[in-house]
Swiss-Prot record:
Keyword Amino-acid biosynthesis on entry: yes
Protein name: Argininosuccinate synthase
GO terms (BP aspect): argininosuccinate metabolic process; L-arginine biosynthetic process; urea cycle
Highest classification ranks of the organism: Bacteria, Bacillati, Chloroflexota, Chloroflexia, Chloroflexales
Species whose genome carries this gene: Roseiflexus castenholzii (strain DSM 13941 / HLO8)
Gene name of the encoded protein: argG
Binding site for L-aspartate: 122, 126-127
A GO-annotated cellular component: cytoplasm
Positions with a binding annotation for L-citrulline: 90, 95, 126, 130, 179, 188, 264, 276
Keywords linked to the UniProt accession: Amino-acid biosynthesis, Arginine biosynthesis, ATP-binding, Cytoplasm, Ligase, Nucleotide-binding
Binding site for ATP: 11-19, 39, 120
Subunit structure: Homotetramer.
């Protein structure tokens, strides 16, 4: 299983798994120096006391970096512009975060002169792929240690026993039945009752959003402004990326916006059942789509939907740092040049309804589209168009003797 390493940088969250990995690495890899790395991408109170906790478990130091601005600006907003959604509903909150975390972890490892990288991803999940593909892109020569593919710990009970045996301070209990991942974009829930896809999740599971039934009885209107596809304002107030997303999270959560229940196809071959809460991201997606309806011509809009599907797969599969993603981003950037304007949404009991949109360079022309008589569109022209457009249908019918 193991071979001696001298210094390892661990992707660290402070949860049960990564807490016990610190002494496990020392025990199984020749007592190396263990450096913990944690990226602040919007976990909030989960980061409280993290450095002290890492040291208490045996780490020599712990980096905690605030990457929220970069995460929103360089990852979430390009994702939004692309229109990527995995398997029709998942807004990719966990998937898109891993490349940034793993890249900075690898950069810290190179800076520290480490000879190994470690993560706490299970051998059944997608995250192991996302982390390790990023390691390959930025530190291909470093050894990768994935304890869940090596150790004999097979359950939460085993992990808690190991923590107690090695005096690792943890707050987890057997009552903590859900596996969660949180960042500024979303909260994910797996495990527990969700392992039966027929069972409705209990309301107590949700941590970000109000139940639609308990949401305000009056709708709330919110206007989101965009500049070339990038969100820049909420209700007329210009905000930076982080503040803008936080504002929309608060507004959306209050109205129960952004709950998704999904049985998804994991990259590693199995299906899994998860529930996601993405209040601000859902508002942004609906608003952005509404503005694109005005700004994009038919062919570009339709082909962009094709790109969005592949972009979603690329993000889900951990292929962020690839030429394909850069090439698709170049295409998306061109499509966003005229996506400047505002979209207005009506939020009510779990629904985010587009009720208005206006663009600086809108392709919608009311003089042409109106049902009233207009000199801008000669309806007689449609006759010749239909004859040409329908010619293949007519020829096929004649061939078959109809």
């Amino acid at each position: 299983m193991s071979s001696r390493v001298h210094k390892v940088v661990l992707a660290y969250s402070g949860g049960l798994d990564t807490s016990i990995i610190v002494p496990w690495l020392k025990q199984n890899y020749g007592n190396p120096e263990v450096i913990c790395y944690c990226a602040n991408i919007g976990q909030d109170d989960e980061l409280s006391g993290l450095e002290a906790k890492a040291i208490a478990t045996g780490a020599s130091k712990c980096y905690v970096e605030d990457l929220r601005e970069e995460f929103v600006r360089d990852f979430l907003f390009p994702l939004l512009q692309s229109g990527a959604v995995y398997e029709r509903t998942y807004l990719l909150g966990t998937s898109v975060a891993r490349p940034l975390i793993a890249r900075r972890q690898a950069e810290i490892a190179l800076q520290e002169g480490a000879d190994a990288l470690a993560h706490g991803c299970t051998g059944k999940g997608n995250d192991q792929v996302r982390f390790e593909l990023t390691y390959m892109a930025f530190a291909p020569h470093l050894k990768v240690i994935a304890p869940w593919r090596e150790w004999n710990i097979r359950s939460r009970e085993d992990a808690l026993d190991y923590a107690a045996e090695h005096n690792v301070p943890v707050t987890a209990t057997l009552k903590s039945i859900y596996s969660r991942d949180r960042n500024i974009w979303h909260m994910s829930h797996e495990g527990g009752i969700l392992e039966d896809p027929w069972q409705e999740p209990e309301e107590a599971m949700y941590t970000l959003t109000t139940a639609p039934e308990a949401a305000p009885d009056e709708p709330e209107y919110v206007t989101v402004g965009f500049d070339q596809g990038v969100p820049v304002s909420v209700n007329g107030e210009r905000l930076g990326p982080v503040d803008l997303l936080l504002a929309l999270n608060n507004i959306g959560a209050k109205h129960g916006i952004g709950r998704v229940d999904l049985v998804e196809n994991r990259l590693v071959g199995m299906k899994s059942h998860g529930v996601y809460e993405t209040p601000g991201g859902t508002i942004l997606r609906v608003a952005h789509q509404g503005l694109e309806q005005l700004a994009l011509d038919r062919d570009t809009l339709h082909y962009k939907d094709v790109i969005a599907h592949r972009y979603a797969e690329l993000v889900y599969y951990g292929q962020w740092y690839t030429p394909l993603r850069e090439a698709l981003d170049a295409f998306v950037r061109v499509t966003q040049r005229n996506v400047t304007g505002e979209a207005r949404l009506k939020l009510y009991k779990g629904n985010a309804m587009l009720v208005g949109r206006r663009a600086a360079k809108s392709l919608y022309n009311p003089d042409i589209a109106s049902f009233t008589m207009s000199d801008s569109y000669n309806q007689k022209d449609a006759e010749g168009f239909i004859k040409i457009f329908g010619l293949p249908v007519k020829v096929q019918a004649l061939l078959e003797g109809r």
